[in-house]
Every structure is written in C-alpha cells, then in structure tokens.
C-alpha cells in the first residue's frame, strides 16, 4: 500500500479515558540486599511520563495534531506533574478532579534496561458521577474529527455507552481500546482495537487467520461495530470492515525492546489519521508503522512524523533522507570515517523555488555531503508570521530530501539552528544572503571546532514571499 502522511495539523481529536502517571527509576544493580534475596538498585535517574489515556494524547500531539484530554485525577502532586508534562507538549487537559482519590500512578524500577518491579498506586474511580465527563464530551464534539475512548478499567469510562451514543449522534467516529471481556459495553463503536489475547478471551482460541476473520466478523455483527482491528504482536494486524475484504498487515518492527504503550500509539495514530482525512485502510497502515517504531523504545513513548516517515519510506535503512538527530550523528560520523566533507545549511524552505534549488546545489558543490536543517512549523510561524508556513514541516522535508543535492534533512524547533549546528559541527557551515560569517547562528561553534563558515548569494528574483503575493493577487483578480 502506497501511503503519504496526512496533514496532521488539520486533525483535532478528543481522548477520554483513564489517565495515569508513569514514573521510572533507573540505576545500576551490582549487589544483592543483605535484608532479603533481592537486587539493590542505586537510583540515578527519575523520569515521569503521562500514561494510559494521557499517553494516547501525547502520541496525537507528537504528530502535530490537536489533542484534548478528559479524565479523572486526584488533587495531588501526581496530578500536577501529569498536567505539567502534558502542557509541555500542548495537550489540552480538561480533567475532573476527585479530591478523595489519588491520581493513578505506576512506578517502574529498571536496571540495564530491564524492568525489575512495578508498583501501582491507585484506588480506582468507581462510583464517580459521570455527569462532568459527559458534559465535557458534549462541549468538545463539535470541534473534533475523532473520539478515542481509552479503557483501562479504572472508572473513567463507567458510562461508556452514553459516550458512544453522544459521538454517534454527533457523527464523529469513536475508536475504543477495550479492556476485559465484556464487549457489550462497546456496542455501536466505529472501531474496536483489541490485541489478540483480548480478542481470543471473547471469541475463543483461533488457530488460523481465517478463524480470526470469521469470528471477528461475527463479533462485529453481534455488537454493531463498523470495523475491528486485531493487533497481533509479531504477526502484525488484521483489519476487518463490513463488506470489504480483510486487510492483513505484517509487523514493521525491527527490534522489540518494550511493548509498554504500543496500543496507545496504535489508537492515537488511527484517530489522528482519520481526523486528518485518511481512509481507515491508510490509517491502519500508518498505525502499524508507528507501532513498529515505538516498540523499539524503552517505556511509554511517542512517534514523531519524522520517525513515521522513515518507517514508511525505509529511509532509515538507506542512510539518507529525513532523519532524527541521533540517526544524523551516526551518518555524519560514518561520512567522516570515509574522508567526506560535510556541509550544513538551514532555512524554512516553505515554497521551494529555483533560487532554493540553485543555492542548495552550490552549497553541495563545496563538499561531499549536504545537511539541510529546517525550521519546524512553530518556529516558522514565529519568524514569518501566523500565516506561515504554507506547507507543513513533513512536506517541506520530503521535497528537500528528494533533491539530488541534499543528502540529509533534519528539523529544529528553536528560532535559530544554533543548538543543532553545535551538536553536528559540520566541516563547513553555509548561509545564503548578506550575512557576515560571525553573524551566522552556529558559526562560532563551527569555527571553534576547526570548521569553516561561508556566505553564498541567493539567485536574484526568487522569493517565497513574492510567490505567495502573486498567488494572492491571482485569487483577487
């Protein structure tokens, strides 16, 4: 299946469910406790990450989509930490605070990337009045393109049928990550995403793909489901839809370190893709690719558009194209080991024109490899105004990566690329325009490391702003 990334900036998703805080304590283990036959971990690093439905919202926000999160918390430090982490990634939190209950927290102790123990701090939210959550859903539905109900059986979805009815009446697709064997609770959902063990707990052991299909279709009929996606670990995913042939997708995972939160990534990608205008088939393809990325990370994690693009295009395997910072560092190290000269430049590159192409070709001629660092969408808006960029980051990077002159493309979030240039330290830093070398962001760091800084002229008569103005004038004529 040939799939391109949708413009996730168009997507608005409502996530409702059981939110929790995941805490991680990391440290080495070198001895056994004299008090009991257990390892002693010397804790050196502590991390806090949103978990459960909050991790689903994080996955959506990491794509550049808008996520609104509704759930139940206590009034405690864990709730404040959860809100802080989510605010940092621009997830809109609309929590219902229950003073008498603690925020659900899961503490994991790890050593050498191995989880030794998990401690759960929770009492659940059974018996809580569903009215405030239902009111928040009603308020949000007119603004969103998809709803996720993330069920961890902690009480936030006690009135799940009422939630499904609200979404269906509003004509908004409702996707559910189920919990337990009572699928009657999810009657009328647009899409259910059980893993294989959850699916078999309801329909019985399946000994072939055909049995999965037959029993899945029967399940859809029984509970009035529009579609069913069974996630099958190393065997990939199976999508079932009414009146359409089953779609089997093999796994794209290369290495599996941790499956924590993989289901959150899948349903988050599905909803964001659908809300951005993708078909269900396309959304499942992207979700499968995202799952292959996230299981290669430790702990609850998210997937960026760059990582997703690499996964569906295979660019990480070729060693060229759109890259993460760590991938680029490796590629640059290998290039230097081959004796190649690395050139780096940066810019917005919103509407690519002949001046850009000429400039990049000239920069490439100055060395053996060319890195182009690209302003993120937020960075571009701060520099160019709220109407820019015209093209989202992923599209801008894809166009640049397709140019013969460009070897590697990487984004940066700041207003200037100084940090990333200081991290990469190219042999030659190039900038177009009338700058002086000492005025160029990152130039001092490159020179201090023994590199060079040069200024190249832009081709006269070529300007993104002029192109935009011409288009606007044409629209007004």
From Swiss-Prot:
Residues 344-477 are annotated as: Cytidylyltransferase. Pathway: Nucleotide-sugar biosynthesis; ADP-L-glycero-beta-D-manno-heptose biosynthesis; ADP-L-glycero-beta-D-manno-heptose from D-glycero-beta-D-manno-heptose 7-phosphate: step 1/4; Nucleotide-sugar biosynthesis; ADP-L-glycero-beta-D-manno-heptose biosynthesis; ADP-L-glycero-beta-D-manno-heptose from D-glycero-beta-D-manno-heptose 7-phosphate: step 3/4. PROSITE patterns: PFKB_KINASES_1 (PS00583). Disulfide bonds: none annotated. Its EC number is 2.7.1.167, 2.7.7.70. It holds the Pfam family PfkB. The active site is at residue 264. InterPro entries: Bifunc_HldE (IPR023030), Carboh/pur_kinase_PfkB_CS (IPR002173), Cyt_trans-like (IPR004821), PfkB_dom (IPR011611), RfaE_dom_I (IPR011913), RfaE_dom_II (IPR011914), Ribokinase-like (IPR029056), Rossmann-like_a/b/a_fold (IPR014729). It is an enzyme of class 2 (transferase). It comes from the Bacteria. GO terms for molecular function: ATP binding; heptose 7-phosphate kinase activity; heptose-1-phosphate adenylyltransferase activity; phosphotransferase activity, alcohol group as acceptor. GO terms for cellular component: cytosol. Residues 1-318 are annotated as: Ribokinase. The keyword Nucleotide-binding applies. It catalyses: D-glycero-beta-D-manno-heptose 7-phosphate + ATP = D-glycero-beta-D-manno-heptose 1,7-bisphosphate + ADP + H(+); D-glycero-beta-D-manno-heptose 1-phosphate + ATP + H(+) = ADP-D-glycero-beta-D-manno-heptose + diphosphate. NCBIfam families: cyt_tran_rel, PRK11316.1, rfaE_dom_I, rfaE_dom_II. In the N-terminal section; belongs to the carbohydrate kinase PfkB family. HAMAP family: HldE. Catalyzes the ADP transfer from ATP to D-glycero-beta-D-manno-heptose 1-phosphate, yielding ADP-D-glycero-beta-D-manno-heptose. Homodimer. This is Bifunctional protein HldE. It comes from Edwardsiella ictaluri (strain 93-146). The gene is hldE.
């Amino acid at each position: 299946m040939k799939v391109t990334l949708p413009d996730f900036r168009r997507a608005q998703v409502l996530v409702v469910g059981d939110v929790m805080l995941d805490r991680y304590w990391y440290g080495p283990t070198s001895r056994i406790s004299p008090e009991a036959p257990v390892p002693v971990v010397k804790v050196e690093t502590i991390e806090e990450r949103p978990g459960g439905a909050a991790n689903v919202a994080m996955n959506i926000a990491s794509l550049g989509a808008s996520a609104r999160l509704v759930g139940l918390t206590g009034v405690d430090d864990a709730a404040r930490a959860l809100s802080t982490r989510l605010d940092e990634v621009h997830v809109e939190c609309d929590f219902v605070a229950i003073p008498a209950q603690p925020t659900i927290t899961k503490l994991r102790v790890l050593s050498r990337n191995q989880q030794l123990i998990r401690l759960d701090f929770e009492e659940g939210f059974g018996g809580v009045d569903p009215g405030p959550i239902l009111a928040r859903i009603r308020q949000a539905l007119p603004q969103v393109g998809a709803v996720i109900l993330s069920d961890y059986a902690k009480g936030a979805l006690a009135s799940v049928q009422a939630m499904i009815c609200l979404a269906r009446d509003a004509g908004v697709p409702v996707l559910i990550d189920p919990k337990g064997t009572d699928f009657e609770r999810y009657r009328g959902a647009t899409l259910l995403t059980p893993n294989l063990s959850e699916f078999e707990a309801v329909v019985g052991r399946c000994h072939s793909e055909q049995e999965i299909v037959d029993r899945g279709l029967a399940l859809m009929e029984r509970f009035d489901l529009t579609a069913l996606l069974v996630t099958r670990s190393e065997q990939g995913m199976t999508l079932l839809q009414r009146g359409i042939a089953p779609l089997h997708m093999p796994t794209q995972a290369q290495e599996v370190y941790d499956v924590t939160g993989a289901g959150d990534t899948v349903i988050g990608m599905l909803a964001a893709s659908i809300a951005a205008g993708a078909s269900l088939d396309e959304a499942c393809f992207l979700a499968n690719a995202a799952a292959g990325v996230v299981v290669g990370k430790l702990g609850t994690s998210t997937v960026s558009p760059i990582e997703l693009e690499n996964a569906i295009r295979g660019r990480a395997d070729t060693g060229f194209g759109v890259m993460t910072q760590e991938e680029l560092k490796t590629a640059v190290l290998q290039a230097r080991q081959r004796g190649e000269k690395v050139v780096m430049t940066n810019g917005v590159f919103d509407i690519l024109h002949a001046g850009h192409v000429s400039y990049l070709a000239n920069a490439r001629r100055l060395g053996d490899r060319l890195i182009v660092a690209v302003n993120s969408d937020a960075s571009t808006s701060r520099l160019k105004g709220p109407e820019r960029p015209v093209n989202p980051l992923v599209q801008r990077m894809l166009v640049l990566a397709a140019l013969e002159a460009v070897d590697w493309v990487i984004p940066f979030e700041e207003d200037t690329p100084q940090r990333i240039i200081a991290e990469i330290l190219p042999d030659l830093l190039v900038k177009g325009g009338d700058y002086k070398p000492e005025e160029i962001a990152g130039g001092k760091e490159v020179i201090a490391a023994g590199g060079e800084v040069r200024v190249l002229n832009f081709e006269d008569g070529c300007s993104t702003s002029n192109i935009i103005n011409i288009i606007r004038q044409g629209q007004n004529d």
